[in-house]
Amino acid sequence: GSEMCIRDRFYNHKNTGRPLADGAWFQKFRSNYIDIDNEPLYPFGFGLSYTTFSYSDVALDKTSMTDKGELTATVTVTNTGKRDGAEVVQLYIRDLVGSVTRPVKELKGFEKIFLKAGESKKVSFKITPELLKFYNYNLDFVCEPGDFEVMIGRSSRDVKKAAFKLL
């Protein structure tokens, strides 16, 4: 059978289930603008710099937490260019299954750092149940148990991932 690839295309949207790949499905569900792509030109959080940065070693200090606990997500950012520069490290979280449809990505934190050429820095984000809350069908502000995906990167499109479970 044929295989279908579904990708996240915009920041903070809900998953439509529509494929982005070329072919018959793409022609059926593509935008009506024939002179531009479906992909946005710049992803949310995109920025320019006079230097380059790399992200590595995304890790969580725990693989699960309770609604009373917290966990820490860390990433190592390295200035791989020849100039000193600033970078905004962004934290996104995705609730994989919820009682109401959840966005494919939500910006939950960011930190601006300055690195000299060749310098590395470990950046940490504290993830609490408060960051996972949303309004359910009854308009209660709740966090529900389940699987979550943590994404850390330089924009909504360029991220490194880790996962945890809320018990």
Identify the function of each model-found stretch.
Residues 2-3, 7-86, 92-94, 149-153, ...:
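Secreted, periplasmic, or luminal enzymes acting at the cell surface/secretory milieu
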Residues 70-72, 120-124, 159-161:
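Intrinsic-disorder/low-complexity, polar/charged segments enriched in Ser/Thr/Lys/Arg/Asp/Glu/Gln
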